[in-house]
Amino acid sequence: VHLTPEEKNAVTTLWGKVNVDEVGGEALGRLLLVYPWTQRFFESFGDLSSPDAVMGNPKVKAHGKKVLGAFSDGLNHLDNLKGTFAQLSELHCDKLHVDPENFKLLGNVLVCVLAHHFGKEFTPQVQAAYQKVVAGVANALAHKYH
């Protein structure tokens, strides 16, 4: 992902304020609610029958935290996202058979959650930088599918 120095600074500055536990669970929960067909990949998570069940599900929260942990790692390797996400790409492609379009959906949901949490601090410029990053991460995760 090519970011200007200003974009990189905007992304890393805001990310330093992100509560990965909270935002990860919320982003994954929203993905499962807004795009309910994604729930089929999480059948082992138990009750996903209602918005309250999804958003309160400890397995959703734990996996969301794990997802954002990997995303954080990616932010430290923006110049090598394909290498950083190679193993996760292989896992999601070969073993889990996740449609790579879902990575784009989750990235867009994450941007919405960040906007919700940071309000005016999440300026259009910050959003543009994050859109570049989530697109790059989605592309890296989809790499093994090609």
Curated annotation (Swiss-Prot):
Residues with PTM S-nitrosocysteine: C93
Binding residue positions for heme b: H63, H92
PTM annotation (N-acetylvaline): residues: V1
GO molecular function: heme binding; hemoglobin alpha binding; metal ion binding; oxygen binding; oxygen carrier activity
UniProt key word Oxidoreductase: no
Chain ranges of the Globin domain: 2-146
CDD domains: Hb-beta-like
Keywords associated with the record: Acetylation, Heme, Iron, Metal-binding, Oxygen transport, Phosphoprotein, S-nitrosylation, Transport
Tissue: Red blood cells.
Phosphoserine PTM positions: S44
Subunit (UniProt): Heterotetramer of two alpha chains and two beta chains.
Protein name: Hemoglobin subunit beta
Organism per entry: Macaca mulatta
Lineage: Eukaryota, Metazoa, Chordata, Craniata, Vertebrata
